[in-house]
Amino acid sequence: MKSPALLLVVALTATLAAAPAVKPLKALLVIGGCCHDYAAQKDILEGGIEQRANVAVDVCYSADKGTKPAFTCYEKDDWAAGYDVILHGECAADINDVAKIRRVLAPHLKGLPGVNLHCAMHSYRSDPNFQKPVASGTDGGLWFDYLGLQSSGHGEQSPIEVTYTDPTHPITRGFQNWTTISEELYNNLRVHQGAVTLAKGKQGNQETVILWTNEYGDAKTRVFSTTLGHNNETVADPRYLDLVTRGLLWACGKLDDSGKPKEGYGPAAGTAK
């Protein structure tokens, strides 16, 4: 006759074995356009995120290297259906059609989290005077309202000193300040009220916000953004990929207060697509 203790162990083992695995977060990376090696960066980001968290990344890539790249994923009205988060890696400075921008923003306005990388901050410029601060709540400020920050350009590439200004935030907790390779430091024309600065970057005497969060619209959608990430070496840097992955998990509500993935969302829990 088997002992009660042995039966308990067997029962617990069977229960754990039968427990369904946590489904991975479904992320869509929209990437392509002007001025960057997106053919390489799409793979770096996809692999880097999936190695760090229980996330399945689909890629919507445009090989168009112009400033008005076309993305097939945006053609459907319900283009974001089935996804838990969208990563915007577009470089689409001259897409200024308000209807198109509203289509891109529609799921975020309803609560779908967003992550925005580097040149996404210089995309969807619907105001011809984007080089000056644009008022919130206007057609010209649509994309900036979503981001929580308005940037219009950058200077020459040189190393950026990264300083974490809020080391207690789950996204940045435990991270050490560092210096990038030669990179582009984006300017800040306006940091919106409600945006939370997490890090600043410095080149010489110029210092700007380079990492922040925002709550967008009435749904208070979680949005995470960083202006870092021009060069492949930076995008492939483990410190950068750690940041992006944490930002994604935070946006989805899957990052605990210590900066670790919540149960089931760490890399060991990942499953095949």
Give residue ranges: language-model regions.
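A glycine-rich, often tryptophan-bearing local segment used as a flexible ligand/cofactor-contacting loop or short
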Residues: 88, 93-173
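Helical hinge/lid and interdomain linker segments adjacent to catalytic or ligand-binding clefts
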Residues: 20, 26-30, 37-123
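Bacterial N-terminal signal peptides
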Residues: 5-15
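Extracytoplasmic/secreted proteins, especially bacterial periplasmic and envelope-associated proteins
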Residues: 29, 40, 44, 99, ...
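Catalytic beta-strand/loop cores that center a nucleophilic Ser/Cys/Thr
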Residues: 50, 56-58, 149-220
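Extracellular ligand-binding/catalytic regions of CAZymes and related secreted enzymes
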Residues: 20-25, 40, 51, 81, ...
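Active-site rim elements
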Residues: 32-35, 91, 155-160, 229-238
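Proline-centered loop/turn at the N-terminus of a beta-strand
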Residues: 113-115, 196, 222
